Amino acid sequence: MNKLILGIYLYRIFSRAYFYLPFLLIYFLIQDYSIIQLEILMASYGIAAFLFSLYKEKCFKICNLKDSNKLVVSEIFKIIGLLLLLYQNQYLILVVAQILLGLSYSMMAGVDTAIIKRNITNEKYVQNKSNSYMFLSLLISGIIGSYLYGINIKWPIIMTGIFSILTIIIIRCTLVENRELNLIGETKGKIKKFLPEEKFWILHYSFLRALILGFFIGFIPINIYNDLKLNNLQFISVLTCYTVMGFVSSRYLTKYLNYKFVSEICLVIFLIIYTYQSFIAVTISMIFLGISSGLNRPQTINKLSSSSNLRVMLNYAETLYFIFNIAFLLMGGYLYTIGTIQYLILFISLLIFIYLIIIFYFTRREQHENKN
């Protein structure tokens, strides 16, 4: 294993060690904010990430940053955001913290993927393996975070900050690229139009990811904490089930379930089971949500990796993801406020129906173009 591949693995493990993430909504919830205030906090992350994604290539060109330096700057923003999260009962400061964390995410989105594509021969293998390491990192950090949360609610945030510092050290020591490769990689791809097949996978990635992560991070913790009133052990069991299945599907099931609409089918099954609103039903439903989430990214990258347009497509997909995620959190938050979790599930079902109609259009268009 060469130094760069080791660096990619370590970077994706350490940078995705979000010890605090499963408890972020609960952390805000115990500060007595309303559901709308909570969803605005969550959406401010996406708004900041979305707005920066529109201009980040221009900003990076002006600053003349190498990809490894972009990742370092991203981690610095994350550390500052995490420090601000420690200020409890200061709503505006928490909003600023979420904005900085959103900027951090937007800066790093797609950069490590581009490094892999330009510098590593067996890129699909490294992508898939490192994706599974990301889920494993989320799983282990979530379990450790639950233990830390039981001791002190701020410790998971502090531990995430420590891992961000370690991530910067890893980047500096291992992610060394040829300067010319960075510049060449960014000038390609913007000329080509997206093919119908590429549009399908871009929409598949951005829309499903927005629904899955929006529901998992933005609503499930409130539902199982406030409505179902699960204890801490049950709470962790539900969240761990999702992460374990995300890891298994990303690492092992991708090669066997590499078909269109598998993620969509799993998401629909999740919604059906989740409506029963019991600990057992919710836990079982997390199996299907985890599979859907775990397949989403590696499957999309595998399908798009042969294109020289990969970086542009991933940036575009991330921008769409932010738009969908913001809209879903705000509209879903309103529905949850005026009704129950059933309102939200019906809303998601309607969104999936509209999404499938659009996907059907892209599929038919692709078939028509292939005939011609």
Where are these regions (language model features)?
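Structural signature of the two symmetry-related core transmembrane helices
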Residues: N69-L84, Y259-Y274
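Cytoplasmic helix-loop-helix junction between adjacent transmembrane helices
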Residues: I99-M134
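C-terminal transmembrane helical hairpin of 12-TM major facilitator-type secondary transporters
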Residues: K260-R297
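A late C-terminal transmembrane helix in Major Facilitator Superfamily
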Residues: S308-G339
